């Protein structure tokens, strides 16, 4: 294990705690320095939080003339409900999306220039449309006779015999194509309130020849508005001048994606670089455009390719033949996401889509209501695998490229260079399982993987360092395991970090990790020498608990455990200590108790060398080194390192005093207070496990009066 002088300690809950404290400050109106007025409703917030999440507020508060504003009035067309949802998202990282408020949230996000939220809303809508599309798609003849033809649907349904001059919407101004555009996302049921839909913006027309359209795959009906339209490689084809300006009738107060010509794209980008410093990143091999529909291949290839977390979520919603290059250009009035915008949120911390890990430096944000922090598993993983904490082999990425994603990506166009394996990994940071299923990764495993990397001091590979999120670990090429910690400790992984060749041990049990013939349980990190024992342990330990207590809600996997549990209700303690006479209801508790008399302390802290009698004491001690206090009080917000301390603290709010003296009838909130009272007032000996009762014969006659 690395020495304290050269180690880096990762606080896994720091980011979530800071955000939680900021939200509490906002709810108590502490240090809020701006009031946002939306349709006569006022919202108090902190400027720094608004700047960090919204491009609109970023541009306002960075302006020297507007940075001191204390009251900001937003456009009256903005929905207060949508702004309230987005404001809560800024402080909690949770976006409350429902079919009734999706349009209000998306419209407000477009106005606030929160592109990552807009993309999430669009994918939410596309997912809803994809479910309704098969039942709503009319036959070809009925569809061609309908008046609701859209440009891409015309192209998909037109016959091959249509000549090029009769192509609909070809070489027509962008404003004329508005007649074919129905309201945005018309297939989704919306609430009675009307929100600005931005359907009056011009749609890009088709600049492809008949041969190109014939060879291109047809666009699915469930995706009516593609994010980009790439130009063919024919340099003789130019973009009409009509597309170089947005529609004049658009209100300037509304945020929308501008459409630029290739000539003015360069000065616009230079202008945005003046306001926002864009960190340099790797140059992509595949260009793409999101906000600018028409861009030459040579210009787009010079744009930075930044893997965004919206594309992580997009893998759950996009069709299987979706193009790989979904990155887009940021509008001039919107900051880069690496500057002031966070990664895209997930809908729920408990959903499968939410099981993603931020590997770009910010720890995984966990719900403050969950008091469990898997620090013990993190500690065990560091201690048990301290010999294998070297850097991850860089060469293993090349061998795993064929297993990263089950999607069949289309071949790149002729004008673009073929994608290298490194670029493919950069384009698709999400690592799916080999079966394509979105399997949930335990939080403890992700914490183990993150802390192990930080303690080892090894940077990620080039493909992983630019990917903000990791959904699934790569599958081990030797033993087939997908455990997050397996990539760090598998002895079969080829690489220069291991000093000697390790024996090959294959495992057919895909849900476990193996090392030198030892099988690990991915749920609790238990070790087994045989695969059959691991399977039996998985079925018995991590399955349903059939034996339930008839007096409480406790349930158990074994009948004997239930019988032992019932002694809690009956008060029976058949196991007695031969030295001090202490009684226990379980033999394991008696065994642990005997270590007090023998002086045995088998559990050692690998950081400071302290030893403990019980493993629970070691678990609590490890939290001192990590600096974590995972148990918050829901009433006052005070955080505690131990669960028992939190339970004792809650008695302050509830007024409960469960410990009482039988002779004085005094009640105490904590057991330590009762012990002190018994020692001082009744002369009782309280350093044993014997119940703290003092007989009347042993009491001096004057002591009861003192109480």
UniProtKB/Swiss-Prot annotation:
Q: Name one GO molecular function term.
A: identical protein binding
Q: How is it modified after translation?
A: Phosphorylated by MAPK1 in response to antigen receptor activation at Ser-334 and Ser-344. Phosphorylated by ATM in response to genotoxic stress. Phosphorylation induces its degradation by ubiquitin/proteasome pathway. Polyubiquitinated. Polyubiquitinated by SCF(FBXO11), leading to its degradation by the proteasome. Ubiquitinated by the SCF(FBXL17) complex, leading to its degradation by the proteasome: ubiquitination by the SCF(FBXL17) complex takes place when aberrant BTB domain dimers are formed.
Where does the record place Pro residues bias?
Answer: 409-420
| Domain BTB, first and last residues per copy | 32-99
Q: Which residues carry this modification: Phosphoserine?
A: 334, 344, 362, 405
**GO BP terms in the entry:** actin cytoskeleton organization; B cell differentiation; B cell proliferation; cell morphogenesis; cell motility; cell population proliferation; cell-matrix adhesion; DNA damage response
Query: What effect does gene inactivation have here?
Result: More than 50% of lethality by 6 weeks of age. Mice have infiltrates of inflammatory cells in their lungs, as well as multinodular lesions with eosinophil infiltrations into the spleen, significantly more T(H)2 and T(H)17 cells and up-regulated levels of inflammtaroy chemokines in macrophages, but, express low levels of memory CD8(+) T-cells and, in spleen, GC B and T(FH) cells are both undetectable. B-cells express 10-fold lower levels of surface IgM than control littermates and macrophages divide faster.
SMART domains noted in UniProt: BTB, ZnF_C2H2
Q: Where in the sequence does UniProt note compositional bias of the Polar residues kind?
A: 331-350, 425-452
Q: Would you say which domain of life the source belongs to? A: Eukaryota
Q: Where in the cell is it found?
A: Nucleus
Biased composition range(s): Low complexity: 458-467
Q: Which CDD domains match?
A: BTB_POZ_ZBTB27_BCL6
Where in the chain are the C2H2-type zinc fingers? 519-542, 547-569, 575-597, 603-625, 631-653, 659-682
The entry's note on the tissues where this protein occurs is: Expressed at least in germinal center B-cells of spleen.
Query: Which UniProt keywords are present, listed alphabetically?
Result: Acetylation, Activator, DNA-binding, Immunity, Inflammatory response, Metal-binding, Nucleus, Phosphoprotein, Repeat, Repressor, Transcription, Transcription regulation, Ubl conjugation, Zinc, Zinc-finger
Pfam families, alphabetically? BTB (PF00651), zf-C2H2 (PF00096)
Annotated Gene Ontology cellular components are:
Golgi apparatus; nucleolus; nucleus; paraspeckles; replication fork
Q: Where is this region: Disordered?
A: 275-350, 405-469
Regions of compositional bias (Basic and acidic residues) in chain numbering: 299-315
Query: Which residues are annotated with the PTM N6-acetyllysine?
Result: 380
Copy the domain comment: Interaction with corepressors through the BTB domain is needed to facilitate the rapid proliferation and survival of GC B-cells but is not involved in the T(FH) formation and BCL6-mediated suppression of T(H)2 and T(H)17 differentiation required for GC formation.
The subunit field of the Swiss-Prot or TrEMBL record says: Homodimer. Interacts (via BTB domain) with the corepressors BCOR, NCOR1 and SMRT/NCOR2; the interactions are direct. Forms preferably ternary complexes with BCOR and SMRT/NCOR2 on target gene promoters but, on enhancer elements, interacts with SMRT/NCOR2 and HDAC3 to repress proximal gene expression. Interacts with histone deacetylases HDAC2, HDAC5 and HDAC9 (via the catalytic domain). Interacts with ZBTB7 and BCL6B. Interacts with SCF(FBXO11) complex; the interaction is independent of phosphorylation and promotes ubiquitination.
Instruction: Give the function comment from the record.
Output: Transcriptional repressor mainly required for germinal center (GC) formation and antibody affinity maturation which has different mechanisms of action specific to the lineage and biological functions. Forms complexes with different corepressors and histone deacetylases to repress the transcriptional expression of different subsets of target genes. Represses its target genes by binding directly to the DNA sequence 5'-TTCCTAGAA-3' (BCL6-binding site) or indirectly by repressing the transcriptional activity of transcription factors.
Question: What is the protein name stated in its UniProt record?
Answer: B-cell lymphoma 6 protein homolog
């Amino acid at each position: 294990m690395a020495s304290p002088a050269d180690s880096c300690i990762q606080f896994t809950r720091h980011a979530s705690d800071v955000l939680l404290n900021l939200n509490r400050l906002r709810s108590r109106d502490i240090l809020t320095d701006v009031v946002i007025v939306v349709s006569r409703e006022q919202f108090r917030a902190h400027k720094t939080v608004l700047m960090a999440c919204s491009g609109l507020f970023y541009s306002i508060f960075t302006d020297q003339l507007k940075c001191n504003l204390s009251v900001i009035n937003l456009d009256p067309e903005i929905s207060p409900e949508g702004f309230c949802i987005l404001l809560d998202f800024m402080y909690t990282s949770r976006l409350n999306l429902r079919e009734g408020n999706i349009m209000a949230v998306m419209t407000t996000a477009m106005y606030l220039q929160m592109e990552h939220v807009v993309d999430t809303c669009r994918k939410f809508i596309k997912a809803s449309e994809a479910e309704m599309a098969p039942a709503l798609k009319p036959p070809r003849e009925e569809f061609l006779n309908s008046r609701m033809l859209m440009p891409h649907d015309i192209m998909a349904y037109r016959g091959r015999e249509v000549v090029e001059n009769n192509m609909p919407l070809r070489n027509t101004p962008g404003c004329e194509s508005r007649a074919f555009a129905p309201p945005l996302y018309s297939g989704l049921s919306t609430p009675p309130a009307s929100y600005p839909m931005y359907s009056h913006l011009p749609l890009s027309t088709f600049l492809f020849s008949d041969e190109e359209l014939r060879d291109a795959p047809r666009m699915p009906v469930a995706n009516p508005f593609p994010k980009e339209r790439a130009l063919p490689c024919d340099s003789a084809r130019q973009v009409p001048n009509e597309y170089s300006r947005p529609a004049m009738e658009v209100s300037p107060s509304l945020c929308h994606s501008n459409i630029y010509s290739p000539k003015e794209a360069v000065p616009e980008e230079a202008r945005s670089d003046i306001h926002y410093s864009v960190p340099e990143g790797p140059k992509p091999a595949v260009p793409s455009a999101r906000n600018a529909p028409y861009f030459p291949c040579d210009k787009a290839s010079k744009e930075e390719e930044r893997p965004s977390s919206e594309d992580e979520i997009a893998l759950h919603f996009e069709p299987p033949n979706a193009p790989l290059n979904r990155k887009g250009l940021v509008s001039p009035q919107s900051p880069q996401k690496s500057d002031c915008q966070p990664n895209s949120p997930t809908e729920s911390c408990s959903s499968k889509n939410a099981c993603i890990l931020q590997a770009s430096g910010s720890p995984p944000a966990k719900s403050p209501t969950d008091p469990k922090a898997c620090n013990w598993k993190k500690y065990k993983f560091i201690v048990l695998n301290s010999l294998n904490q070297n850097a991850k082999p860089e060469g293993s990425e090349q061998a795993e490229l064929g297993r990263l994603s089950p999607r069949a990506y289309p071949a790149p166009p002729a004008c673009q260079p073929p994608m290298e394996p490194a670029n493919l990994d950069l384009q698709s940071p999400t690592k799916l399982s080999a079966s394509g299923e979105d399997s949930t990764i335990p939080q403890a495993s992700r914490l183990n993987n993150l802390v192990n990397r930080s303690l080892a001091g090894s940077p990620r590979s080039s493909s992983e360092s630019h990917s903000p999120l990791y959904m699934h670990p790569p599958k081990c090429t030797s033993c087939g395991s997908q455990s997050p910690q397996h990539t760090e400790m598998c002895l079969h992984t080829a690489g220069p970090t291991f000093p000697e060749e390790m024996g090959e041990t294959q495992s057919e049990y895909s849900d476990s990790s193996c090392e030198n013939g030892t099988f690990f349980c991915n749920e609790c990190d238990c070790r087994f020498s045989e695969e059959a024992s691991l399977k039996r342990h998985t079925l018995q330990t991590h399955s349903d608990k059939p034996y339930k207590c008839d007096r409480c809600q406790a349930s158990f996997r074994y009948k004997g455990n239930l019988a032992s549990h019932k002694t809690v209700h009956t008060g029976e303690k058949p196991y007695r200590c031969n030295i001090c006479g202490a009684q226990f209801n379980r033999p394991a508790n008696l065994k642990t108790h005997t270590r007090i008399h023998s002086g045995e302390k088998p559990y050692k802290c690998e950081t400071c060398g302290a030893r403990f009698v019980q493993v629970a004491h070691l678990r609590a001690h490890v939290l001192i080194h990590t600096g974590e206090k995972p148990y918050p009080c829901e009433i006052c917000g005070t955080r505690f390192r131990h669960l028992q301390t939190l339970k004792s603290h809650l008695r302050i709010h509830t007024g409960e005093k469960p410990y009482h003296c039988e002779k004085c009838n005094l009640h105490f909130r904590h057991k330590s207070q009762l012990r002190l009272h018994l020692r001082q007032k009744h002369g009782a000996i309280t350093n044993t496990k014997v119940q703290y009762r003092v007989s009347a014969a042993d009491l001096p006659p004057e002591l009861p009066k003192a109480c």
